[in-house]
Amino acid sequence: MRAKSILFIFIALFTLHIDAQFQQGRDYQRISSVIPIKKDGKVEVIEAFWYGCGACFSFEPTLNRWKSSLDNDTKFSKLPVAWGPIHQLHAKLFYTIEALNLGNNGHSAVFNAIHKEGNYLTSDNAIVDFLGSLGVEEADVLKQMNSFSVKQKVKRSIELSKKLKVNGVPMMFVDGTFKVQAQRNHNDMLDIINYLIKIQKPNS
């Protein structure tokens, strides 16, 4: 019994230590929710990003490994920021890739093209050529790029980028309640997100 009591105290103290590591105002901020959150028992995590962002590029492999570890009670999505013309063009590229079901391979190819090959994808024609190099027919690319659905999603990205006051990327949001800005260490950022997921689960 004594050993069990000591173990319980140790676990409790360890948990308190972990929780004390993260402080509101220093490691994360509480925000006024501008994202409609569906209370379906799942915690919603959003990453605001831009393909042209070097920090987002270096974060991507760590983020993908983290995503694969998420349980069914957490859902993750990306929000391509749409501050100006080039960001809006890349947001259109993001949603076109989604519509073409190219998935993570497509997104990784974009990051590599920009940051490793110097192909900055600054026009519709450049995007058509790039997606063609991935084996997608030009007609299919143009159909999705110019679709009502993709245009509406880009419009939503513009609105959310403003409402969420995204002033740097990568930036992450948990349940439309907490904001976490980029950290020096990618794992530190995800440790904070894991902490916020844990405290949000009872409220989802």
Q: For each predicted feature, which ranges?
A:
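Short histidine/acidic/glycine/proline-rich micro-motifs that form metal-
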Residues: G52-G54, P80-G84, I114-E117, F148, ...
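Extracytoplasmic thiol/disulfide redox context detector
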Residues: R2-P85, K155-I158, K162-K163, Y195-S204
